[in-house]
């Protein structure tokens, strides 16, 4: 990330970065046949994955974690995740839901 002195410029830079993130959303089978929703492609150096995961867990009323550069949510939330990420400022066009 380039060095930015003005806080307003830094905020604008983060907004531009959000609009450029290619995000992939898919499900995986976890232990005992349970399903988890995986969100990857969000740059963990620029964004706090823990904070994003916390907001998503609250909105979806589920458990989850942020680890290994991706967010894992308990359950299948593919139908709602695109709208929620768009509300957080990510471009809906760059969110791929499988």
Swiss-Prot record:
Pfam families: SUI1. GO terms for biological process: formation of translation preinitiation complex; regulation of translation; translation reinitiation. Coiled coil: none annotated. It comes from the Archaea. PROSITE patterns: SUI1 (PS50296). The keyword Ribosomal protein does not apply. Keywords: Protein biosynthesis, Translation regulation. GO terms for molecular function: mRNA binding; translation initiation factor activity. CDD domains: YciH_like. Gene3D superfamilies: SUI1-like domain. Transmembrane segments: none annotated. Belongs to the SUI1 family. PANTHER family: DENSITY-REGULATED PROTEIN, DENSITY-REGULATED PROTEIN HOMOLOG. This is Protein translation factor SUI1 homolog. It comes from Pyrococcus abyssi (strain GE5 / Orsay).
């Amino acid at each position: 990330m380039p060095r930015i002195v003005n806080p307003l410029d830094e905020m604008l830079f983060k907004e531009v970065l959000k609009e450029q993130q290619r995000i992939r959303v898919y499900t995986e089978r976890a232990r005992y046949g349970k399903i988890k929703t995986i969100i990857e492609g969000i740059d963990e150096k620029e964004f706090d994955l823990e904070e994003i995961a916390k907001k998503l867990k609250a909105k979806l009323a589920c458990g989850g974690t942020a680890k290994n550069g991706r967010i894992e949510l308990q359950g299948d939330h593919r139908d709602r995740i695109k709208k929620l990420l768009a509300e957080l400022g990510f471009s809906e066009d760059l969110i791929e839901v499988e």
